[in-house]
Amino acid sequence: MTPLNKTALAACCLLAGAVQAAPVAVDPAQTYVNRDGTVAIVGNDGLEEVITQLNALFTRQHPQVRFSLRMEGSSAGMPALTAGATAFAPLTRDMWPGDQAAFRQVFGYDATPVRIGYNGHGPRPPAKTPPAVYVHRDNPLAGLTMEQLGQVFTAGAPAGDVHLWSQLGATGEWTPRRIHAYGLRDDGGFATGLRHARFGKRPFAAQYEALASRDAVIRAVAADRYGIAVLGWVNAAPISDQVRVLPLAATPGAPYYGPDKATVRAGNYPLTMPVQLYVNRAPGKALDPLVKAYLQLALLPQGQAILDAQQESEEGYLPLSETDLLAERRKLDAL
């Protein structure tokens, strides 16, 4: 057994004992507690099966706690957390900037995310592929680094902006050709979240052409040998066979990875979207004991097994890698 495995096992045993030994009670003064005494959870509808099973697991250990679900989408979870109408917000992506600003305006600090898994892998038609870079199938590049991706799609990158394929190492007919970047509109959704979370909040480059739909983006790249796009949650196969997913490296010199199951499960894919539970925890104050116990359970082997069982579902959720699992447990211990 490796030292990391031993550390993980020891941490798991200690955490399991702590969770099982500490009873929790529903505080009726909490705004997320309904009149009938149930604990409200509002969040992503694709997570309903996961949260239902986590609730059942939690209730077996704490029979006095009951839950009510309203799973309407990630866009419903954060407003509910801001309003105090949910114990936590289950999301299958990072919080969008508008939701972050609204929460901060009310409380004066940011909501805290705790990852419990990864959201999706692919390509695996007919399921949707998680966020990925798409190029024309004739594109000669083996991959890009995340830094290069930011240089292509945004203006003002620290290492300079990139406008030509030759700047990325392409040769021959590609040497003089300009890069045509495509994506979704910068309207507070996926594209805006991408800018904020991955590209330092920089504005999109002048060469970025925003289109109205995912299908339109795929078709644009399929018709443009010099096109490139960053897009999430699309099954490109029925739209066009003229595009391919371009692998990514987290840092210069690191291996290129695509969003396949093994890579996502290992925590190596740079554009992986997390399955995470956002909580309201004021700086310097302890996290609500019931919420903390729930999150601890989600990070135990029993909780991770619930994510693992979803790997071939439409959503394709995966449990955390050993490294990320330890990191989230340590984060939670400090809350």
Predicted regions and their residues:
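Flexible loop/hinge segments at secondary-structure junctions
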Residues: A22-L335
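Gram-negative bacterial Sec-dependent N-terminal signal peptides
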Residues: P3-V19
